[in-house]
Design a protein with these regions (language model features):
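ATP-binding N-lobe of GHMP and related small-molecule kinases
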Residues: 1-96, 116, 120-125, 160-162, ...
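Residue-level signal for inorganic ion chemistry
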Residues: 11, 39-41, 70, 103, ...
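Short beta-strand scaffold segments in enzyme catalytic cores
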Residues: 13, 37-41, 137-141, 147-148, ...
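Solvent-exposed alpha-helices and their adjacent loops that cap or buttress functional pockets
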Residues: 31-32, 132-133, 139-142, 159-164, ...
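Glycine/serine-rich anion-binding loops at beta->alpha junctions
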Residues: 89-118, 136, 237-250
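Contiguous, small/hydrophobic- and glycine-enriched helical/loop subdomains that border
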Residues: 107, 111-148
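Conserved, helical-rich catalytic subdomain that frames metal- and/or nucleotide-binding sites
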Residues: 142-239, 252-266, 270-274
């Protein structure tokens, strides 16, 4: 059985405060984008019960496969019941550590795919609870629609936002941004910004209304990322921002983006919302 985990961008990211548990409270609008990995899960009677054989292709994923979020997600379902042996393959298209949520999306889709394949009958609330334990933004990828995210990112509320026909240009410079470092170097705002209200304003106003408060600390250490944002605005983007903690920067265009040249080590995707 196949699934196609999708990526996301953040429209605005307000880091509100650091919590006693070490996490940060945030406020952000998470938007699905049509950039996908490919995940396949099949049963194999020759494998032992609860055995997972996991393989990967495509873009490189750091770390041991057994520590991958996909394996951790399926293992979380094994806590409730014994599962048959599974062969799992992930073809990676969404870059890791890029602010696009690829790893969290893979984990969320692994939960749903395993539930459907094996007819486990897990409720949406149960899957979201597991997802929230796997990663702060993991539960978002179970919903597949625009959401206002609060708390660590796991408190979600649907938002009405029509981006159909709009074009988004993603540029990833291949720079690894440490999320921990980005959080360590920023100053939390201390208050919510009501981003859910602000995003209802015309897109021409978003530049002033939807800040990513992680940008100053990231741009200070990685001016090449800041330069991408400037270039997108210079070429007609209605709105441009770093997604999450970076390093991907996106521009939203009313019309098809113009042809641009980028360094060879930059990954670029031009996508359109259906």
């Amino acid at each position: 059985m196949l699934s196609f985990p999708f990526a996301k961008i953040n429209l605005g990211l307000n880091v509100v405060r650091k919590r006693a548990d070490g996490y940060h409270d945030i406020e952000s609008i998470m938007v699905p984008i049509p950039l996908h990995d490919v995940l396949e899960i099949i049963t194999d009677d020759e494998l032992a019960r609860n055995e997972i054989v996991y393989t990967r292709s495509g873009l490189s994923v750091p770390g041991e496969p057994r520590a991958d979020l996909v394996v951790r997600a399926i293992s979380s379902l094994q806590k409730d019941c014994e599962l048959p042996g599974l062969r799992v393959h992930l073809h990676k298209v969404i870059p890791m550590g890029a602010g696009l949520g690829g790893g969290s999306s893979d984990a969320a889709h692994a939960l749903v795919l395993t539930d459907q394949l094996l007819h486990l009958g897990c409720s949406a609330d149960h899957l979201e609870g597991i997802a929230a334990e796997l990663g702060s933004d993991c539960a978002f990828f179970l919903r597949e629609k625009v959401q206002l995210a609060l708390g660590r990112g796991e408190i979600l509320s649907p938002l009405s936002l029509d981006l159909s026909g709009k074009h988004v240009l993603l540029v990833n410079p291949g720079i690894h941004v440490s999320t921990a470092e980005a959080y360590r170097n920023l100053a939390p705002t201390g208050a919510l910004m009501d981003l859910g209200f602000r995003v209802q304003r015309p897109m021409a106003e978003w530049r002033e209304l939807l800040p990513n408060t992680m940008e100053p600390s990231v741009f200070e250490h990685h001016p090449a990322i800041a330069a991408i944002k400037s270039k997108l605005y210079a070429t007609g983007a209605a709105f441009a921002s770093m997604s999450g903690s970076g390093s991907t920067v996106y521009g939203i265009y009313e019309e098809q983006p113009p042809t641009m040249t980028w360094p060879m080590d930059h990954q670029v995707w031009s996508l359109t919302w259906a």
